[in-house]
Amino acid sequence: LMTGELFEIKDNCLKVVSLDGHRIAIRKMPLKREYSDRKIVVPGKTLSEVLKLLKDSEGEAKICPSRRHILFRIDNYTVISALLEGEFLDYKSALPKDKKTEVTVSTRTMIESVERVSLLITDRLKSPVRCVIGEDTVKLFCTTTMGRATDQISAEISGDQLEIGFNNKYLLDARSEERR
């Protein structure tokens, strides 16, 4: 199922997994009380409505899943939805089993750096943002027919050095999450 998001409760943590065919987003957060382990798939349209309510909310959302439905309580609003039936895609098979490199960097710093090197990218001049991961820095660069942009940021790095390219729009999508 790709029309919904996986909510997985395991070891007193809630993991939410979303896929769009190009990217995987995973968010894991501890739960305040004990729950039995389970997996449910919540429709994407329901979560879009819940997100609208959360943007205007100061408080916490309460999530109450049942066997076939889920209830979200946000401030004075209640959203009830049927759950999707079927198995969520096996996203774990797309994740590397052994990590050879781990990079820890400030989300804001990374986004600002990607924005700077993306100035040369247009709809006509698409080019990946290349990241060269060294000992304690990440060098970002982009080359188009208009020129070359480079930037460098500090990072905590363990493992092998690496060079990898990304679509800048996918990296910049983290902006909305970083602002929360």
Identify the function of each model-found stretch.
Residues 1-28, 32-84, 99-180:
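DNA polymerase processivity clamps
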Residues 94-98:
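Bateman (tandem CBS) regulatory domains
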